[in-house]
């Protein structure tokens, strides 16, 4: 039985790879970040040198629809007029987003393929590549007041604040992960959020039990004691479970940390529940334009969620400021991943907690 299932799985992968043959060269090209198809007979790629357009005579509308259906079958999902949007992971771990009519213009199909990094970089390696070369400190409390107010902080916060004030961001983030600070990585799509989150996750001590919650497998957890939980995006997939159900399950699985892959829609509310349940040390991502704007984005996401709709906006924002210790803003600058801002303000949190 197991051999039959293994054979069936291999056959399914072979069918997908055969269908993807017209773009296989782009999938194998390690210099590319993104592969997009906006319409039949054309492929666009993004690499270090920017966007390029390539004619693709083999990619007719029917051929693209064939790819969409095979990918849907491979990922145990459906794509049709009634379900025109598909999020999936290809056999090579590339993330693919497919949109077909009527959700896009007639006779067109949109495919966006995000290629995973060919290797995982350590925080130190990223720093040596200039990750923090343009980084600015962001806080509600004036930075000039930090040194004079160190005596207000506990020992670990004193050490963190010292590294932060000295712009020793590698030491700062290393300490932050080890002492289970809640870290939010913000930026737009393709800004390097996942690359940085992998580097930070690698800093979690090996003796901690980690539960990850994702809609597509992307996070790399090198620690031996971890469980990767997957929820069905938009109710697709074999199991109709969402982040709420997985979080409730994770809380019963003896976790030291629960890591949500990305905060959007209802997941932002469950992020608050996770932190508030006594499981700090979260490392997660959100789409936002600046570090402080991440608070506003999170407030909107929580407010729009089913669980947070009745909460007042100011209460949500205050709760987020009290719970999120660090926000790291990522951006791609001239084709290179950069951290442009780091928010850290223990004094603001201390005021919210009443000086405790």
Curated annotation (Swiss-Prot):
InterPro entries: AAA+_ATPase (IPR003593), P-loop_NTPase (IPR027417), T2SS/T4SS_dom (IPR001482), T4SS_GSP_E_ATPase (IPR050921), VirB11 (IPR014155)
Gene3D superfamilies in the record: 3.30.450.90, P-loop containing nucleotide triphosphate hydrolases
CDD domains linked: VirB11-like_ATPase (cd01130)
Subcellular location: Cell inner membrane
Chief location: membrane
One GO cellular component, as annotated: type IV secretion system complex
One matching Pfam family: T2SSE
Annotated GO biological process: secretion by the type IV secretion system
Keywords: ATP-binding, Cell inner membrane, Cell membrane, Membrane, Nucleotide-binding, Transport, Virulence
Chain positions recorded as ATP binding sites: 187-194
GO MF term list: ATP binding; ATP hydrolysis activity
General function of this protein: Component of the type IV secretion system VirB/VirD4 which could be a major virulence determinant for subversion of human endothelial cell (HEC) function. Altogether with VirB4, may be implicated in providing the energy, via hydrolysis of ATP, for the assembly of secretion system and substrate transport.
Protein name: Type IV secretion system protein VirB11
Underlying gene: virB11
